[in-house]
Amino acid sequence: MASACGPGAAGHCLLLGLHLFLLTAGPALGWNDPECMLLRDVKALTLHYDRYTTSRRLDPIPQLKCVGGTAGCDSYTPKVIQCQNKGWDGYDVQWECKTDLDIAYKFGKTVVSCEGYESSEDQYVLRGSCGLEYNLDYTELGLQKLKESGKQHGFASFSDYYYKWYSADSCNMSGLITIVVLLGIAFVVYKLFLSDGQYSPPPYSEYPPFSHRYQRFTNSAGPPPPGFKSEFTGPQNTGHGATSGFGSAFTGQQGYENSGPGFWTGLGTGGILGYLFGSNRAATPFSDSWYYPSYPPSYPGTWNRAYSPLRGGSGSYSACSNSDTKTRTASGYGGTRRR
């Protein structure tokens, strides 16, 4: 009869003990936990700026976190970044992270942070616990635009003030402003040409004005047509003598007879108004109307922050329109940190 502790029994007991060890130690080590993953087996990560990581031992962290850089964290915020596993260096995974960035910015230092399943030294990490920490730096173009904006700080301050008044929220008042301007122009034209104002009496003189002596040789004139000033009509010709259609408006004595604006003043004002409206129709493509200031063309690219020091224009600028940001694919390279 074989002993229970014989060689055959010893081998059987060893296998049974190993099986029991695997059943008890395996779950403790996370071998059967679907949330436990070997770090080097993670092939890619897709991270979002408005989401948090999973957590088990520690608090969750943002999937994307800017930690500094020459451009600062408030200048631009990428929405989605994808990181790919580029290899194993014997201790950590090396990552290449890509996203679309404004042409003024680039990635600085990057590091992928993952929560170790049991500790910060564990090769296994919790699924979904990885996030990216990155620095945001200026490109050469961004530094150039930054220097240019520093030289034009005064103009930038004016444009900031202008944008507050002529933002998209106030564009619905443009029609009202146009009506007010047109009414003002109509009032000025009425006062200059159609309104018969009050005139001051002529200065005392022993001799009558030249126009009065001239009228002795002409027949009396009737009243001027309704709606027009008398100095624009003058004495009417009834067939005897020669008179001018504009009468005393062109005589040397008008300064004594009329203290209000004369024909030449009205003509000059009309010319100025015509020039303003003509300039509006011949405006450059960089302005929308004569009461919106024109902006010169700048480098074809805009910056994400409204009226930040790096704000530029692509084509025309209007306070009531938006322009797209010019971007390109940027890459950042870094390793892994387990927490």
UniProtKB/Swiss-Prot annotation:
UniProt GO cellular component terms: endoplasmic reticulum membrane; endoplasmic reticulum-plasma membrane contact site
InterPro entries assigned: SARAF (IPR009567)
Region (Disordered): 313-339
Lumenal side: 31-173
Subunit-level organization: Interacts with STIM1; the interaction is inhibited by the interaction of STIM1 with EFHB.
Location relative to the cell: Endoplasmic reticulum membrane
Entry's Gene Ontology BP terms: calcium ion transport; regulation of store-operated calcium entry
Biased composition (Polar residues): 316-330
Comment on protein domains: The cytoplasmic C-terminal region mediates interaction with STIM1, while the N-terminal lumenal region mediates regulation of SOCE activity.
Swiss-Prot/TrEMBL keywords: Calcium, Calcium transport, Endoplasmic reticulum, Ion transport, Membrane, Signal, Transmembrane, Transmembrane helix, Transport
This protein's encoding gene: SARAF
Protein name from the UniProt record: Store-operated calcium entry-associated regulatory factor
